[in-house]
């Protein structure tokens, strides 16, 4: 009875946190991931106390969720290592895949063996981490796939967040965003303003905004339609400073399209909503080999971004877990 009351309390707090997050970040998938993790975790714990058949079904479902994520991650890591050679991110992916599999088995093993105390606590924590990571990747991937088409309605401004440069030119990674923005710009009638947003890194000879401006100008975009934002260093600052420039040059209430790499879209959508932008997301397809690197990084970044909202239920779960 105490365990059930605790699980319902965690769910209630997660639902409240979800409502707060949804109000702030609108349709960003980051809102749903913690709630879905909590629901899956609570259902599995509840089914584990049920007769054998329901218990087995719940365990299989949760294990398959995690194993699908681990398998996709391993596949993309292998592709990346074959085409680009070993890297830190690739090695991290090689470690994460078996870790996710191990985490998916932690709680079923613990409950089957009737563990108690610290052992059960660790099993719960590991299992929750595996579910969190797996559901995050699934949610971000689905969001990216559903935002690859151009918006049906007209937009007033296109925002392109910066990325790494090669010398004074956009990297292929950044060029794919710019090409996607150009495609949307032409479809909108070649009269939409484009905000290129990105400061100058310590290892860059020009700002990302300057490099993007030159690239777009070479592709036929008039200088008068390109607005440079060259002070931001993070995605949050991209959205904040871009909003300020849009209001300064064009006024408030502009309809905005944020164009970025597909796996970067959830974080862009989250911060655009938090800045009050009326924005739609448009994704540029990432290279197959960059999939694992991008989703690992985005999962970590988004987890860090929402910790202030979901810190309370996480703390309750860790401290009070029966």
List each model region and its residues.
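Membrane-anchoring/interfacial helices and their immediately flanking loops
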Residues: 1-82
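Aromatic-anchored segments of alpha-helical transmembrane domains
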Residues: 34-46, 98-106, 321-322
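Transmembrane alpha-helices and immediately adjacent membrane-cytoplasm interface residues
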Residues: 56, 63-85, 90-146
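A structural signal for short, hydrophobic/glycine-enriched beta-strand patches
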Residues: 101, 118-124, 128, 132-296
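Membrane-embedded alpha-helical hairpins and interfacial helices in multi-pass inner-membrane proteins
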Residues: 294, 301-305
